[in-house]
Amino acid sequence: MAWAQWYEKTTDVDGFRFQEAEAIPAWFVKDFIEATSDVPAAAKKKGTDEAPEYVHKDIFAVGDFWHWNTEYLNGYIKATDNETSMFDVPLHFNFHDASVADGEYNMADLLKGSLMMNNPEKAVTFVDNHESQVGGVLESYVEDWFKPLAYAVILLREQGYPCLYIGDYAGIPQVKVKSKKTILNKLLKLRKKYAYGTQHDYFDHSEVVGWTREGDEEHKDSGLAVVMSDGMGGTKRMYVGRQFAGAHFADVMGNAKYDIKIDDEGCGEFYVNRRGLSVWIKKDCKL
């Protein structure tokens, strides 16, 4: 693995992506990451037996293993001695299936079978990529109407390491994919300022699901409630924390035109419109 150490020392990169990881032996990935994590700080002095000093660096690695079964993905991760993460392909397929089901998808199963839920510390979550996009070699495109919902899942939950697709952010004119920059910027700001604290899941309905984050003391006014629907929409009673009792929350996505009051138990009746996404934070808080 001398070449791997040379490459790391020359480029000083801090991570690697292994394309088609299913064709790369797990032992190779393990040895490669271990080699690039400890790079000689200086060459061995000529004519001496003095060993070179090594500098340790935390190298991030992710494998692109296009398989819907988390058992295969976790097996590969384990075989690398947990040196690599994996793209959450099962979650992507859930997004795709929900987006093309015309309201017939069971939203309670949206996270079922995903790395996000099964091995969150090793899950690199994504919505689409260069292979799943329209015209891609593994086309399984997540329809545009569902993109806000899918990105809310990977950006506003505590599990997973989210990855944004440049094709969604900037658009792909060649295949008539419009930019989602405005809504993605809003979700990124929500992640940075408000998506903190204990999480409570409400994936208990076929059409309307959601979760809340209670916030923490380190991030002023943090905490939020997310509710989404692939059907006619509706309301969902969710617990956001007793510390918010009496506070008014507003939907920063602009889909609900009214604010709600959190009750004495720390719960609110959070609304979402048809095939929509609503993200509720304390009223008058800014992005």
Predicted regions: what is each one?
Residues 2-287:
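Active-site-proximal helices and loops of the catalytic beta/alpha 8
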